[in-house]
């Protein structure tokens, strides 16, 4: 006798559930197989502060070729004005033809040299700043990396290490000391933010000078505006010195600051030998050194420097 299997609703539901599970499992496996390679190929996100400096650096590389024709045209117009003024002075003074020819030749040589200097701006000016930066990197050593986001990371680790000591027991036993610890962590974080901001400003300043400074060299052809070019060259040296000193100070300071984190972890942070105040003081001193020393030294070294373009144009009249 043939037996017919009776399919109940419960058995149908069981089979549907098993099939649904198999389908879902297959979908999950397929999704993981597709997603893992995509995640592996996703590039690492650029840190925020390093990204800001990188954007200005890349933009400055585009500014220079766009501004170079404008600087050259401006230079030619002002050079014509300079020769017109010189010719009027030579005529009014009734100089001899030999004197006029000699001065004209010397002035023409100077103007031609300055035009060649503007045309080859990328050959002369960027190596000044880049050379100072390379010297700073070489001085601090290859094992030390100076970057704004790296400084922020050190500050965050230090501040979080301080905050990790503020457990519930400490807050209940000594609320005032817990408040002091939280304030100390805030001061440490602010100090490192200031250091990173100063480094970002110096880097962006150098990029702006290298990218847009060629325009101010266009004023070098006329005695009344040649001071712009003189000041730009001196300012370029000042920016290079500032970047160099920042690399030295921030590089050494970052190495010192990294040693504070294990010191905090290994000590009784709220005891009589607590290093909390010293760590806060060290972070603030680090910030003050970064803000004051590079700018002051760069100003002293390049503040009164001058190539003498305006003086040379006047002397050859």
Show which residues each predicted segment covers.
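Juxtamembrane inter-helical linkers in multi-pass membrane proteins
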Residues: 137-139, 211-224, 304-316
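Hydrophobic transmembrane alpha-helix segments characteristic of membrane transport
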Residues: 82-108, 200-227
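Alpha-helical transmembrane segments and their helix-start/interface "positive-inside/aromatic belt" motifs
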Residues: 17-26, 97-116, 131-132, 230-242
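Binding/recognition "hotspot" determinant
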Residues: 38-81, 88-91, 133
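Hydrophobic alpha-helical transmembrane segments in multi-pass membrane proteins
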Residues: 77, 81, 111, 115, ...
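Hydrophobic alpha-helical transmembrane segments
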Residues: 24-31, 74-84
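Non-cytosolic segments of integral membrane proteins
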Residues: 115-209, 248-309
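Long, intrinsically disordered, low-complexity regulatory segments adjacent to structured domains
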Residues: 3-5, 9-25, 282-317
């Amino acid at each position: 006798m043939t037996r017919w299997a009776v399919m109940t609703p419960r058995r149908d539901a069981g089979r549907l559930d098993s099939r649904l599970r198999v389908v879902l499992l297959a979908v999950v496996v397929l999704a993981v197989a597709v997603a893992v390679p995509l995640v592996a190929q996703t590039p690492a996100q650029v840190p925020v502060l390093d990204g800001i400096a990188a954007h200005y650096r890349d933009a400055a590389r585009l500014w220079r070729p766009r501004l170079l024709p404008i600087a050259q045209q401006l230079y030619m117009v002002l050079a014509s004005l300079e020769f017109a003024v010189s010719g009027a002075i030579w005529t009014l003074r009734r100089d001899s033809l030999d004197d006029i020819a000699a001065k004209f030749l010397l002035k023409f040589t100077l103007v031609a040299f300055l035009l060649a200097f503007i045309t080859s701006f990328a050959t002369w000016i960027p190596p000044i700043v880049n050379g100072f930066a390379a010297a700073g990197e070489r001085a601090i050593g290859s094992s030390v990396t100076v970057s704004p986001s790296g400084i922020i990371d050190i500050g965050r680790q230090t501040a979080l290490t301080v905050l990790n000591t503020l457990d519930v027991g400490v807050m209940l036993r000594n609320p005032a000391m817990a408040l002091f610890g939280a304030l100390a962590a805030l001061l440490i974080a602010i100090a490192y933010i200031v250091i990173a901001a100063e480094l970002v400003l110096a880097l962006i300043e150098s990029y702006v000078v290298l990218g847009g400074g060629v325009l101010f060299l266009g004023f070098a052809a006329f005695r009344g505006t040649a001071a712009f070019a003189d000041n730009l060259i001196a300012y370029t040296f000042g920016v290079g010195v500032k970047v160099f000193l920042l690399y030295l100070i921030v590089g050494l300071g970052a190495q010192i600051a990294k040693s504070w984190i294990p010191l905090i972890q290994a000590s009784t942070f709220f005891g009589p030998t607590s290093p909390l105040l010293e760590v806060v003081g060290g972070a603030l001193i680090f910030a003050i050194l970064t803000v004051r020393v590079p700018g002051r030294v760069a100003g002293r070294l390049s503040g009164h420097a001058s190539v003498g373009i305006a003086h040379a144009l006047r002397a050859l009249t």
